[in-house]
From Swiss-Prot:
PROSITE patterns assigned: PGM_PMM
HAMAP family: GlmM_B
Protein name: Phosphoglucosamine mutase
Post-translational modification comment from the UniProt entry: Activated by phosphorylation.
Length: 445
């Protein structure tokens, strides 16, 4: 039986895969697993969401599940995912729930749960919650024991004060175009950047519940690239639907991805003495160019599986201070327990202001090798890599690349696909090898 929880919570098409009934059951199960009876105070869970239309329905269902188990729901409304994680700690809540499908299209939605302190749950805890969903509720409280719903009007201000601490140098000399993806960053990001002194121009910051991630945000950079050049801005920043990602665009309209952002921040943090053990944590999807840049700088790279939860686990295990993903999830444990796109944007602009260098100049140490990624639909993503014909195709590709590139096969954590990624000295070679391996994978259908 497939796990209920994927790499980033429970996701699916809202009202088909992720129904109100399932959301209620998840709220109830999380309340039973994560809240502890016998508190001197009432048990509390923070609940937030992104602005997609189905969020209102799922929020109501989750809150019904929580309150039915005697847990008060502290409703913070539309806020970034990292804000919900932070507020779970700041309000000393038992746990937090974020309703969002991040960068996914509008019809999708998801539920991710943060434990005490705003930390993501481990697999064992998620599996126990899934078991409780299957079991259904037990005896429920009545009367005064039923949970209450409380709104938190200061939630956004508390989060903005928190991320504002990341600003080491005022940003008054910088003009930034911000693509908010019609998502949870639409209110928070412009306020945070303006509070730090930046001249902020916004695009895609008018959420109506239906337009989230629609041709905009960190998965559609073209509009932002054009806007930065058109306005003559110093840089652009793109967030996704729940603002846990940040990608950038330099003044020339060139995309600065998560790998390049990590290089900039790692070098800055080592200079300031903040880079613990002179180590950066990245995933297997990070470009070989990142590894080469860090090698040249004398910085070690610790590699994890794909997913910011695995980056977080490695950061905590090694007490490291910076990690992230090529997609723009950047984690700084001293400031947060999960990827925070707005925090990343502030740190990046602070570095520009401090050094008085352009983003292009700061990102110069990162030389990205051409990378080709092909998603192949398969019947069983867990067994494809063991097929002899696939192993043979991979071995041939590795022999052709030698030490000038690399190949990676991995099953998606959220879809029934296998991702074939090849990096090489030139794009033609990368594409040819990726296509050959992808064809061998597709034959396993």
């Amino acid at each position: 039986m497939a796990r209920l929880f994927g790499t980033d919570g429970v996701r699916g098409v809202a009202n088909r895969d992720l129904t109100a009934e399932l959301a209620l059951a998840l709220g109830s199960a999380a309340a039973r697993r994560l809240s502890t009876a016998g508190h001197a105070r009432r048990r509390v869970a923070v609940v937030g969401r992104d602005p997609r239309a189905s969020g209102e329905m799922l929020e109501a269902a989750v809150i019904a599940g929580l309150t039915s188990e005697g847990v008060d729901a502290l409703r913070v409304g539309v806020l970034p995912t990292p804000a919900v994680a932070y507020l779970t700690s700041a309000y000393d809540a038992d746990f937090g729930v974020m309703i969002s499908a991040s960068h996914n299209p509008m019809p999708d939605n998801g539920i991710k749960i943060f434990g005490p302190g705003g930390h993501k749950l481990d697999d064992a805890t998620e599996d126990r919650i899934a078991e409780l969903v299957q079991q259904g509720p037990g005896e429920r409280p009545v009367g005064a024991g039923i949970g209450r719903v409380v709104d938190a009007p200061d939630a956004l201000d508390r989060y903005l004060r928190h991320v504002g601490k990341a600003v080491t140098t005022r940003l008054d000399a910088l003009t930034v175009v911000v693509d908010c993806a019609h998502g949870a960053a639409s209110a928070a990001a412009p306020l945070a950047y303006r509070a730090a002194g930046a001249n902020v121009l916004t695009i895609n910051a008018d959420p109506n519940g239906l337009n989230i991630n629609d041709g905009c945000g960190s998965t559609h950079m073209e509009t932002l690239q054009a806007a930065v050049v058109s306005y003559g801005a110093d840089l652009g920043l793109a967030h996704d639907g729940d603002a846990d990602r940040c990608l950038a665009v330099d003044a020339n309209g060139r995309v600065i991805d998560g790998d390049a952002i990590m290089v900039v921040l790692a070098l800055a943090m080592r200079e300031s003495g903040e880079l613990a053990s002179d180590t950066l944590v990245a995933t297997v999807m990070s470009n070989l160019g990142l590894h080469l840049a860090m090698r040249d700088a004398g910085i070690e790279v610790r590699t994890t599986s794909v997913g910011d939860r695995y980056v977080l686990e490695e950061l905590r295990a090694g007490s490291y201070s910076l990690g992230g993903e090529q997609s723009g999830h950047i984690v700084m444990p001293s400031m947060g327990t999960t990827g925070d796109g707005i925090l990343t944007g502030l740190r990046l602009m602070s570095r520009m202001a401090q050094t008085r260098k352009s983003l292009a100049a700061l990102a110069e140490p990162m030389h990205t090798l051409p990378q080709v990624l092909i998603n192949v639909q398969v019947a069983d993503k867990t067994t494809v890599a063991q097929a002899p014909s696939v192993q043979s195709a991979v071995a041939e590709a590795e022999a052709a690349l030698g030490d000038t590139g690399r190949i990676l096969l991995r099953p998606s954590g959220t879809e029934q696909v296998v991702r074939v990624m090849v990096e090489a000295a030139d794009e033609d070679t990368a594409r040819q090898l990726a296509v050959r391996v992808a064809e061998s994978v597709s034959e396993q259908r």
